[in-house]
Amino acid sequence: MCRKCILNKDWEKIKSHILSVHSQVRKLVGLPAKPPKAEGSNIHLKCNYCINECVLSKDDISYCGLRNISKKEIGELPFPSRSKGYIHGYIDANPTNCCNAWFCPAGTSRGYPNYSDYNEPEFGTYSYAAFFYGCSFSCLFCQNWSHKNFSKRNLFDVDRLANQIVKNKKITCLCYFGGTPEPQLPFSINLANKILEKIKKLESKRKFRVCWEWNGSGNRDLIDKCMKIALNSGGNIKFDLKSFHEKLNLALCGVSNKRTLENFKYLAENYFGTRGDDMPEMSACTLMVPGYTNHEEVEQIAKFVSEINKKIPYSLLIFHGDYQMRDLPITPRDQALKSLKIAQKYLDNVNLGNKFLLGFT
């Protein structure tokens, strides 16, 4: 179904088809078609970590797949918590391919000397990449869809992980991504705080930054805590603004982007610029999906961001076919350059990421 039909045709008919497609795709990996909403005496668990706000009966599975009461009761899949999280972690040499590396302390000289010991990119150091399993969205074009496949062996203890990270003094930052961190925000907050507390006790001069990359659908109180950690440590937060129109977000990602836009606006209005002009606290990012996230969509997103603050960094990413959209081509060069030019009309700091993929077009 094309972009024009999604935005302009009979929405009730379009929506029915969209939900059917997502239902079939999610069934392939054992996930519910929509967020469960148990009622009355059937309620066994309520979760408010993200926009989906699942209400589970004993037979339900949360939309993210991380909370399965039946499997929890037999010990097959314990619930994630503040002290345990489903995560795949590894060290990544700085500067990394992180979406914000073009302006962060690890990839530039920004942040020196308050948040980095290097007056240049931090070569010879590492970022701890914390890949979270589970997601509050269900993107048909997901570039990291392995997050849907996890088991008990992927459950890590927060203290053990914090000690491992602190022990390696070459690790200068922690980046949460996934999936998306929202379904496990309490764990991410606890881990970040423990690392920073341990470093402060052991060696007060060590610089250590914490960053989040997410779809922005999280609980307001929790994302506020994340922002404060990122702000104080010299890290930042990247929002995936996958689309501007809610209908398009529902079509591509299965979930509304209403809370994403609200959360972006809230954090930007309250925190962006508080560290000064040289250290952006947050950014926006958009994957240019051919035929869907075109220059018109990019213009709406760029305009939305600019109305909050023109200095907020915005990154446009080249798409390559993956997951259920493997048949789509790489973002055409003309589309990428046109979108870049349009975004630059609205914003002062625009970046084109994954440029190497243009060599395959």
Residue ranges of model-derived segments:
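Auxiliary Fe-S-binding modules of radical SAM enzymes
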Residues: 1-17, 26, 32-42, 47-58, ...
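Conserved Radical SAM active-site core
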Residues: 66-232
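Flexible, acidic/Gly-rich N-terminal and inter-domain linker regions that tether
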Residues: 1-125
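Structured core elements
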Residues: 46-49, 129, 175, 238
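A general structural-boundary detector
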Residues: 37, 117, 122, 126, ...
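Generic domain-boundary/flexible-linker signal
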Residues: 13, 58-61, 75, 141, ...
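Conserved AdoMet/S-adenosylmethionine-binding subsite of the radical SAM
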Residues: 155-330
